[in-house]
Amino acid sequence: MKRVGILTSGGDCQGLNAAIRGVAKGLYTEFGKDVEIYGIRDGYKGLIFGEYKLMKPEDFSGILTLGGTLLGTSRQPFKTIRVIDENSVDKVKNMKDNYKKMKLDCLVILGGNGTQKTANLLREEGLNVIHLPKTIDNDIWGTDVTFGFHSAVEIATNVIDCIHTTATSHGRVFIVEVMGHKVGWLTLSAGIAGGADVILLPEIPYDIDKVAKCLNDRIKAGKKFSILAVAEGAISKEEAALTKKERKKARENFPTPPSCTASPRSWPARWTTRSASACPATSSGAAAPAPTTGCCAPAWGPPPPGSSKRRNSASWWAWWAASASPSPWVTWPASSRACP
């Protein structure tokens, strides 16, 4: 009698139930009644606390196209897997003990790169482990495509594609944030398929000046809208030179961009140049000074009541940012990130 355990760990995605069904069908086809499959609940959590049940063939029926995972899932960070918690639970020891308690010949684990690290740890502890690469990020070493990736690309592509109509109708710049903390496969694939005008990836630090130039070039070419596909882990060239802690601190200190209803079609009239020495004249006729090279003051209207009259004051530049651009994050030059 062969005994096989199966669990899913980490975030859910399309294809989990299909993969579970495939494993079960393959085992039943190969061994028939001489195999027992144990479904382990909620990922590694179930293996740690002994939450599992003996599955039957009918349990795997009708789940081929069902989203999520019938086994449940949870996140168990690899960096804490060997840490004894406040309840004196030795997670690694418990997993080994429950593996032996079920008398498993093999443990099949479905998950991403964090799950893979823990699976490898269990292998090093003497357990027979098979890891099936599941992640929408497509960042598992040793495989071309992970299951869950293609479905995520399709969904992200549809979002980018559908937003074109609104962007065109209102003449706006849209930023579509796509999942991908350290890798940009999903953003790249969806951006290309969905027709994004700018794609920013974690692997390639971006130059905000080039991004702004690209958007302005589209405006000059008569394009009323632009769509940016941005991976959640995308960073600028300036941020890339910082440590992780420095980057986090810099982002915490960076001002939140104010909201605005200005459209890109008004940019050329409002922001004719990005040179500090060639800013358009203010209402008083004098060129407004910029706090740093690359910033440019607007040429219309006085600051709102209550704000400082000094054009190098924080309140004045906050007003300028709100008036000049619907997205200061995009249009502010990299050299001007110190703008208050």
Question: At which residue positions do the language-model features occur?
Answer:
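Short, acidic/small-residue loops that bind anionic groups at enzyme active sites
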Residues: 30-32, 36, 122-146, 200-207
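Accessory alpha-helical/coil subdomains and C-terminal extensions
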Residues: 98, 109-111, 117-121, 149-170, ...
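Short glycine/serine/threonine-rich phosphate/pyrophosphate-binding segments
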Residues: 13-23, 47-48, 92-93, 104-120, ...
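Short beta-strand segments
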Residues: 7-8, 39-41, 72, 109-111, ...
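A glycine- and small-aliphatic-rich helix-loop capping segment at beta-alpha/alpha-beta transitions
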Residues: 21-30, 54-59, 121-131, 147-151, ...
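Short beta-strand elements at the ligand-binding edges of bilobed clamshell
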Residues: 142-153, 287-294
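A cross-family phosphate/adenosyl-ligand binding-site feature
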Residues: 1-8, 19-105, 114, 236-241, ...
